[in-house]
Amino acid sequence: MNYLDLARNQIQNFRSSKVSQSNLQEKTKILKNLKILTLSFKSLPPSKENPIQAEFELAREVNELEMELSCLCKNERAFELSYLQVKPFYFDYIKGILPKQSDKYLYYVGLYLLFLLSNNRTTDFSTELELLDIRDKKNPYIKVSMDIEQCIVEGNYSNLARLKNSNDENY
């Protein structure tokens, strides 16, 4: 079994059951092993070798899993570091290495935007929004962040309660 198949199997193992408080240590161990495994990916930066699309896709997914796990653990530092590691996969590597993925990445960008707002980092929030195109800003995960920011700017805190109910538990 090659290293890519091993990574795919570990990702499948991670996703086989929902992350909960009861299996948190097991999921953390799997993720740690996945992060170590991605170090063996020969084409990831700062390598000068030709990029291998499968390695980039798996590395992106490992960082997304880490973001999800850090949300559950309420570890803000790990969440931010995970986002900063996955961000190039969303905005930089799509030029010639990774195909433009579905809107799945907007889920993670939206979480990060909420993180920035919750830490009163409105300048960073605005900077991140500028990376998105107009179509992306209409996505529900991005729109809720923009609506919350608008309520904060206007001082309209009564509308924040209305925005509180979202379809996703991480939001």
What does each model-found stretch correspond to?
Residues 1-62, 66:
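Internal amphipathic alpha-helical repeat/solenoid segments
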Residues 23-37, 76-86, 122-128, 160:
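Solenoid-repeat scaffolds in large eukaryotic assemblies
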Residues 83-171:
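Alpha-helical scaffold segments of alpha-solenoid architecture
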Residues 9-12, 58-61, 65, 69-72, ...:
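"A position-specific structural signal for the A-helix of alpha-solenoid helical repeats
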Residues 18-22, 71-74, 114-118, 152:
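Hydrophobic/aromatic side-chain positions at a characteristic register within alpha-helices
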Residues 15-22, 35-38, 42-46, 75, ...:
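Eukaryotic basic, amphipathic alpha-helical target segments in cytosolic regions
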Residues 51-58, 71-81, 97-101:
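Alpha-helix boundary/capping segments in eukaryotic regulatory proteins
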